[in-house]
Amino acid sequence: MKQIWMILVSLVLMTFTGPGGFAAETAKTSLEALQAAFNGESNANAKYLAFANKADEDGYAGVASLFRAAAKAEEVHLTNHAAVIRRMGAEPKADIKTPEVKNTMENLQAAQKGEIYERDEMYPAFIKLAQQEKNSDAQKTFRFALAAEGGHARLYGEALNNLENDKIAKEFMVCPVCGYTAVTLTGSACPVCATPAEKFIKIK
């Protein structure tokens, strides 16, 4: 009986574990959500840098640039999350897992899946928690991340569709304030946070 109970607990934990190795859906407060998001973004940053190295090895320069740009965006997000955590009197904590690196196509698929999860499930739930607590700082950092993750999911999808025809951009631009990521900017400022275009970080 005890063995069966342990198996059930393990299955529940697996169900609630997000792509960064954290139990995002178990967060009950905005602080817990911030810690989960910080952990997730920290793991995503490490994972995308590893994926970039593999893409370089596989000869996909554009995909490598995309992964590096996404890693920089996740760095922006984890920095923003950490700042709010500290303002709430806590210290950010991350459990960095060794990334599982496969071939570049599989890495793109895994990355897109993680971004879709954050876009459709994780960050909307975290924003709701922050709204319930009227935590405006948490709402802001979550909304910044949500906007960027949606863009990352789209960019990964485009990269998958163009993986073999070499039509993937070799340079990307990342907003240093919200992490918005794009190949080019259509205006003079970030469409998410209004940071001037000249402050964007160029990633190759």
Predicted regions and their residues:
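Non-heme di-metal
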Residues: 22-204
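Positively charged n-region of N-terminal signal peptides that target proteins for export
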Residues: 1-4
